[in-house]
């Protein structure tokens, strides 16, 4: 999975410099962070609704599709802020051996 995130991160970085008329990602970057955040919020809502539907009807296709959209737009946001996907992977790896309760408690100390 890390390979696809690395590849996608590279493509997203390249698209920051592309013509906004030729690339969806470039057009998001050109419109700025607020537009990107709007898309992240929209995809988050769609993911939540798909999950609720999946619980009712047992179909996971839309949850997978909407989660992919959410991850994609989150990666665009990170790219816009010059944060590489590897930085998120490192943070997840750091948390892997920490219980959720310990991690949550440590946030209050920062």
Swiss-Prot record:
The keyword Chloroplast does not apply. Its main location: cytoplasm. GO terms for cellular component: cytoplasm. It is found in: Cytoplasm. One of its GO terms (biological process) is L-histidine biosynthetic process. PANTHER family: HISTIDINE BIOSYNTHESIS BIFUNCTIONAL PROTEIN, HISTIDINE BIOSYNTHESIS BIFUNCTIONAL PROTEIN HISIE. Belongs to the PRA-PH family. This is Phosphoribosyl-ATP pyrophosphatase. It comes from Hahella chejuensis (strain KCTC 2396). The gene is hisE.
